[in-house]
Amino acid sequence: GRIMSKKNPITVSSWTLGDQCKFEDRVIAAKEAGYEGIGLRAETYVDALNEGLHDEDILAILDKHDMKVTEVEYIVQWCEEHRSYEQKYKEQMCFHMCELFNVGHINCGLMEDYSVEHTAQKLKELCQRAGKLVIGVEPMPYSGIPNMEKGWAVVKESGCDNAKLIMDTWHWVRANQPIDLEVIKDIPADKIVSI
């Protein structure tokens, strides 16, 4: 096999490849563009199943093109008191995908704006459901966790070893956020799961 970029593969986001292509076309496009891994959302995985593919077929396509799934996403609405069945199913699907593709973390976002205390408690509950998987909280400027400061406060207060942060530079650049590394100087490096 090919040696990936040190231990962290260069991954193309599921969103970059859209949602209007067949699974194998997604893999081929990523490979031809030079990526070492692809991200998959629960929805794009279900799309592959709806093409008539089974888990074994998906793994065979990845192997055929020397590609790996290196990112699983996207759990949302995890702070709601009464989560919908759709969100519960999606969460379980993400757990299954991590096991299937040997991915250690799940990207999670939160559009709703709650207090740090409430969000940290709900993150703790999500982390407990996730077991050994890492929950990567992704701050986005237009979300309920709009910056690294609130993200870190939530992750820290949750007290969970498997709660970490994701730093998505695309969101910051697109939202014209200041590039100031001071915002992460107090965050231990091992609490950032993905950049």
Predicted stretch roles:
Residues 21-24, 61-68, 78-167, 174:
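Active-site acidic/histidine proton-transfer and metal-coordination neighborhood
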Residues 1-103, 160-164, 190:
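N-terminal pre-domain/capping segments
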Residues 181-195:
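Aromatic-lined glycan-binding groove of carbohydrate-active enzymes
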Residues 28-29, 54, 153-154, 182-185:
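Glycine-rich, phosphate-binding/catalytic loops in enzymes
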Residues 46, 171-173:
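Short gly/pro/ser/thr-enriched loop/turn and capping motifs at secondary-structure boundaries
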Residues 72, 108, 195:
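Short glycine/serine/threonine-enriched helix-capping/active-site loop
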Residues 147-148, 177-184:
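Histidine/acidic-residue-rich catalytic or RNA/ligand-binding cores of hydrolases
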